[in-house]
A protein has these predicted regions:
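Short, Lys/Arg-enriched N-terminal segments with co-localized hydrophobic residues
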Residues: 5-19
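Short acidic/histidine-rich motifs immediately flanking catalytic phosphotransfer sites
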Residues: 60-65, 85-87, 214-219, 242-245
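Short beta->alpha connector loops at strand-helix junctions that form conserved
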Residues: 69, 93-94, 110-121, 210, ...
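Phosphate-binding beta-alpha-beta segment of Rossmann-like dinucleotide-binding domains, i.e.
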Residues: 108-164, 176-179, 183
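Rossmann-like dinucleotide/phosphate-binding beta-alpha-beta segment
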Residues: 153-243
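Rossmann-like dinucleotide-binding domain for NAD(H)/NADP(H)
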Residues: 244, 252-346
Length: 346
């Protein structure tokens, strides 16, 4: 395929081949820092803090491509607006892409590319951090000691060593999480539609999901969000979980039915819950809402529990991961502009 874009002149860098005009949605200062470092002036990157939706699609008028993040909405109607404005490529700067209507994108001739790999260690390690913080009540101890309260009542945890850990999804992240938990001396069970030979070689035992839930002291979710996995953790599956188990979700918020989860927490069925994602996080996560009432009663209720720890989709957020995400995004833009596909093309 011939190169799609003529060269443009960028003042401080001279003429660059296949330069694209790109609008980067949902950006913060750190996004700009890392993307600019990766870009090296090759493409014209314009930034907006706005998230993509039907109203903000007009901002992309006249752009060759848009760069999106997990909470940007690229529905069929939004994609039609983008296509009308000249957009022919979406650079998704994440692994997940359930926010993009791929069928509509293909129909409209919009190529979509993602970051298929960055640092699986970042997410796996954050899942462990959530677990350990919950189990040893670190968040509660931190708040106490800041007020010079050094009492231990209410801070008792459990040994992780000897626990049974259920890993739901054994891709790169799930496999690394399993390795870490084996290092703690845990027995690791797994569920996935495809068994990973690496996990089998490690001694991980694959079992049906119901068996995993019933046997595990800790359940950690590492699967993508598809119609088949939506609300896979629901009233029935929560009831099957071992009493006083921990549930960790660093994958996608839609995997968990939040209303059912609240009932399981209120009943005392779960020892604790660590969430880095939330089904209705769009418009809330990545934003400072500290000066206004929380607009989501379900999220507010979850945060109010002393044995629930919520972080704002930060599991991926390490220097190494953001560097790789930025470099891969720029490579995707450059390959598309030069008429090439790569392993990240959806």
């Amino acid at each position: 395929m011939a190169a799609l874009y003529a060269s443009r002149r960028i003042a401080q860098h001279g003429v660059k081949e296949h330069c694209m005009k790109v609008l980067v949605y949902d950006t913060h200062s750190y996004d700009q820092t890392f993307l600019n470092a990766a870009n090296q002036g090759q493409h014209q990157l314009d930034y907006t803090p706005a998230q993509l939706d039907l109203q903000t699609a007009a901002l992309a008028q006249g752009y060759d491509a848009v760069c999106l993040f997990v909470n940007d909405i690229a529905s069929a109607e939004v994609l039609e607006r983008l296509a009308e404005g000249g957009v022919r490529m979406i650079a998704q700067r994440s692994t997940g892409y359930n926010n993009i209507d791929l069928d509509a994108a293909r129909r409209l001739g919009i190529t979509c590319m993602r970051v298929s790999y960055y640092s699986p260690y970042s997410v796996a390690e954050h899942a462990v951090a959530l677990l350990m913080t919950l189990n040893r009540r670190i968040h509660r101890a931190f708040n106490r000691t800041r007020e010079f309260n050094f009492r231990l009542a209410g801070l008792m945890g459990r040994d992780i060593n000897g626990s049974t850990v259920g890993v739901v999804g054994t891709g790169k992240i799930g496999t690394i999480f399993a390795k870490i938990m084996q290092g703690f001396g845990c027995t690791v069970l797994a569920y996935d539609v495809r068994e990973n030979p690496e996990c089998i070689a490690m001694g991980v035992r694959y079992v049906p999901l119901d068996d995993l839930l019933a046997a595990s002291d800790i359940v950690s979710l590492h699967v993508p969000l598809f119609p088949e996995t939506h609300h896979m953790i629901n009233r029935e599956s929560l009831a099957r979980m071992k009493r006083r188990a921990y549930l960790i979700n660093t994958s996608r918020g839609g995997l968990v039915d939040a209303d059912a989860l609240i009932k399981a927490i209120e009943s005392g069925h779960l020892a604790g819950v660590g969430l880095d994602v939330y089904e209705e996080e769009q418009g809330k996560f990545f934003r400072d809402l500290s000066d206004r009432p929380m607009p989501d009663d379900v999220l507010a209720r979850l945060i109010s529990f002393p044995n629930v720890l919520v972080t704002g989709h930060q599991a991926y957020f390490t220097e190494e991961a953001v560097t790789t995400i930025s470099e891969t995004t720029i490579r995707n833009l450059s390959d598309f502009a030069a008429g090439r596909t790569n392993e990240n093309t959806l």
